[in-house]
Design a protein with these regions (language model features):
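Conserved glycine-rich cofactor-binding loop
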Residues: 10-12
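Conserved glycine-rich Rossmann-like NAD(P)H-binding loop of the short-chain dehydrogenase/reductase
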Residues: 26-40
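The beta1-alpha1 cofactor-binding region of Rossmann-like NAD(H)/NADP(H)-dependent oxidoreductases
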Residues: 35, 57-67, 99
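Substrate-binding pocket helix/loop in short-chain dehydrogenase/reductase
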Residues: 93-94, 98-103
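Active-site helix of classical SDR
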Residues: 117, 153
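Residue(s) in the substrate-gating loop at a strand-loop-helix junction
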Residues: 137
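SDR active-site lid
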Residues: 170-263
């Protein structure tokens, strides 16, 4: 019987991941600030015949995260997988952000990942087994305008994870840490993110459904991989940043500004979730079902790499045979 802890599990990707892990036979501990949404997430897990534990807390509180890990091991058993999904953001130009906002985004998105990793690591290393999955973004590699705080925090988490991975390799530890870099996903966060944009925030197209992200997270937990790039926008962003970063600067400067704003004007006085959760009844999906893709061919290819390689070799053999036949 396997146990997984998922932070940020009250809605969006974390909520979809809780269901996906339960479908694979895991008992699931869900962690986030909003107790009501956590109870709903736990009910979905129990409806699938698995045990669930609700852990309402703020991942920026290291002591609370550590105490929660103790509870999980006492009640559900040893933690096999820890998924760091919790994150937050503020939309706006750099000069519009306050020091407090930058601190808060960093605390949740970066320090929350670090605290979750430390809580998992202190339990997994003595057992010499376990997997830590860092839910990241293509923005950890290629930053975009209007989300400087979030991009910086995700890049920091990638640097932290790379260092940890090397330490585990040096010690020949069987504990594994992996990162899943996601594209834009249709989650409820766009309805409650703090924003100073003149128009309502939206995911930068193309957009994917949370179930695509959840499938990638579960696969990364169960298969050895250093990183998993989900969706062609992430792959192109990573490659573009490595090959032609200056060109990418100009591309995102032109495209990402308008692409992150809908045609609807921003609603004045709308509550946001930066400091406190917004009390709304939501699950995994946001309001962009009309444009979100339910699958990713590139993710399928990664998950079936051997079959794809075999098919490619088969096609190559047929082509070589055809050329030889035509020559004769």
């Amino acid at each position: 019987m396997s146990v997984v802890v998922i932070t940020g599990a009250g809605a969006g990707i974390g909520r979809a991941s809780a269901r996906a892990f339960a479908a694979r036979g895991y008992d699931v501990a869900v962690m986030a600030r909003d107790a009501d949404r956590l109870e709903a997430a736990a009910a979905e897990v129990r409806d699938m015949g698995r045990r669930a534990m609700v852990l309402p807390l703020d991942v920026a509180d290291a002591g609370a995260v550590e105490s929660a890990a103790e509870r999980v091991e006492a009640e559900l058993g040893p933690i096999d997988v820890w998924v760091n999904d919790a994150a937050t953001s503020v939309y706006g130009t750099v000069d519009q952000l306050t020091a407090e906002e930058l601190h808060r985004v960093t605390d949740v998105t970066y320090h929350g990942t670090v605290y979750g990793t430390l809580a998992a690591l202190s339990r997994m290393r003595p057992r010499d087994r376990g997997v830590i999955v860092q839910v990241s973004s293509g923005l950890a590699y290629r930053s975009i305008p209007l989300q400087a705080a979030y991009c910086g925090a995700k890049a920091a988490a990638r640097g932290f994870t790379d260092a940890l991975r090397c330490e585990l390799m040096h010690d020949k530890s069987n504990v594994r840490v992996t990162m899943v870099h996601l594209p834009a996903v249709n989650t409820p966060q766009f309805s409650w993110v703090r924003s100073r944009l003149p128009r309502a925030a939206q995911p930068l197209p193309p957009v994917y459904q949370p179930e695509v992200a959840a499938k990638a997270i579960v696969w990364a937990a169960e298969h050895p991989c250093r990183e998993l790039l989900v969706g062609w926008p992430v792959v192109l962003g990573v490659l573009g940043q490595r090959i032609a970063p200056g060109l990418m600067d100009r591309y995102v400067a032109n495209r990402a500004w308008e692409g992150q704003q809908s045609d609807e004007p921003a609603r004045a006085g709308r509550p946001d979730s930066l400091d406190e959760p917004v009390a709304v009844d939501v699950a995994a999906h946001g309001t962009f079902d009309f444009e979100a893709s339910p699958d990713s061919p590139l993710l399928w290819a990664e998950m079936h790499r051997r079959a794809v390689a075999g098919a490619a070799l088969g096609v190559a053999a047929v082509m070589v045979g055809a050329v030889r036949f035509l020559r004769h």
